Swiss-Prot record:
Pfam families: Hepatitis_core (PF00906). Residues 143-183 are annotated as: Disordered. The lineage of its organism: Viruses, Riboviria, Pararnavirae, Artverviricota, Revtraviricetes. Residues 155-177 are annotated as: 3 X 8 AA repeats of S-P-R-R-R-[PR]-S-Q. SUPFAM superfamilies: Hepatitis B viral capsid (hbcag) (SSF47852). Phosphorylated by host SRPK1, SRPK2, and maybe protein kinase C or GAPDH. Phosphorylation is critical for pregenomic RNA packaging. Protein kinase C phosphorylation is stimulated by HBx protein and may play a role in transport of the viral genome to the nucleus at the late step during the viral replication cycle. Keywords: Capsid protein, Cytoplasmic inwards viral transport, DNA-binding, Host cytoplasm, Host-virus interaction, Microtubular inwards viral transport, Phosphoprotein, Repeat, RNA-binding, T=4 icosahedral capsid protein, Viral penetration into host nucleus, Virion, Virus entry into host cell. Self assembles to form an icosahedral capsid. Most capsids appear to be large particles with an icosahedral symmetry of T=4 and consist of 240 copies of capsid protein, though a fraction forms smaller T=3 particles consisting of 180 capsid proteins. Entering capsids are transported along microtubules to the nucleus. Phosphorylation of the capsid is thought to induce exposure of nuclear localization signal in the C-terminal portion of the capsid protein that allows binding to the nuclear pore complex via the importin (karyopherin-) alpha and beta. This is Capsid protein. It comes from the Viruses. GO terms for cellular component: host cell; host cell cytoplasm; T=4 icosahedral viral capsid.
Amino acid sequence: MDIDPYKEFGASVELLSFLPSDFFPNIRDLLDTASALYREALESPEHCSPHHTALRQAILCWGELMNLATWVGSNLEDPASRELVVSYVNVNMGLKIRQLLWFHISCLTFGRETVLEYLVSFGVWIRTPIAYRPPNAPILSTLPETTVVRRRGRSPRRRTPSPRRRRSQSPRRRRSQSRESQC
């Protein structure tokens, strides 16, 4: 079976493959981030979102892989074979789990549409010959505001004032979104 864990989220393994392996933070940092930002929702018996569910599954899979690595370390007699198995788990399986964790944490943090826009932007940037592309890759947290998903029913803010209207001298106040619910 060819199962793509990103398909239902509008992405694909191929789309994430444009990001180099050293782009993704280490597992410990990703797990700490997930815990710091989404612990309550991840531990809740309530269903919050498909991203929360996928994040839970990735965390559980990593735990099981660590159990396997520990078992192999304890039970495989040959040190060279033991090292090969542990290395394979850390490098190959670890990368897949790091990609999954990064994707779902990013979708929960920035919004799915923003993350997909970032993946497409990065894919275009990396495939553009060096002579023709900007020196710096796109950065997820600095994507233009136009990629931010807005709630339905609200019209988007105007980007520039009309020529007849003068801009106020006082800074605009932004509405702060309440973080009452973690979901």
